[in-house]
């Protein structure tokens, strides 16, 4: 029996538990972006009900990002302190609860509705803060470098998949039964997903479906398989954490990555806030039609997002260079996304949809910022590093909706808004080509008190 057992062991196939992990990240991120997009789909009807102008709408759109930015560093600290599984569960559960409660804001009247809506959107943003740093930590723990780009592109492409799936559903709900049901539907589904998360997600060393060969494979490729076991029981003084943060802020590479992510997110936030409104107000579509039309560029963004990761990992295997593997899709994708500006010069509906589809295909290919983070984050503060990255990136979520609101409110047109977003794509390209330099994992220097 012993010899048979040894023989069986020697031919044991490597498990692929990490694939189910990234599937779960994809599902959760889809709900994450679905919840963010609820207001953009229901927004036109809500604005009519409560008398909200474009500038006011811009501020309400930005409420999520104010909190999301504020919550990034605390969220990253919580992830490093208590681990991804527990913190992420509470994040999903709480943001879903606040999403559901937005369906009840019409119990208030007048300005009270606006205050309630802004407050609940703010709380959703605060609760979602650990989500993407959590995604990045989990990918860094589960995936070797040669698979990391694809893993990141899969969960990152969920933002487009969310629009493909949920925009038509939310548009139909708004049209047929009223905007409040959009929030009931998304909030309820999210609460269910939070409990599925607890059953599916485990650390690599504790996953019941992983074998030794898979652990050895991912560890050999640079996966940080002991990340949470090392961090959850260690208390680090604030002075040390601050010293580590200053090292990140002093890195030219990281400054370039932060600026690039800010600019890439300008495209993201245009898409999940103003794009459906653009289709309704600037192009005269019904809410129902806009919900379906918005899914076309989203499909292209999804395809581009997955393709960007595959291309990046293929380049990594062929060249062994993180610079070539990560920068090439980012630069080419952002250049392609600038075609959205051409929408200002055409009035044919299919051409507008086509240019937007190309733009979001390019944006999908170039959305590899989280792969760069998984490649560069110091192992001691991977959650905090991801939180800092996401904080800078999502300042764009505050600025972009408000800036577009002012542009549209002042000019009465979306033409300037599309130019504004296109210029950000160009700045992202320059940031990666000029500022970032060599992409490599940061090794922290000892800090006094450590």
Swiss-Prot record:
It is a multi-pass membrane protein. One of its GO terms (molecular function) is transmembrane transporter activity. Residues 42-58, 106-109, 175-176, 276-290, 351, 409-415 are periplasmic. Residues 1-20, 80-85, 133-153, 198-254, 312-329, 373-387, 437-450 are cytoplasmic. NCBIfam families: 2A0114. Belongs to the major facilitator superfamily. Phthalate permease family. This is Probable galactarate/D-glucarate transporter GudP. It comes from Escherichia coli (strain K12).
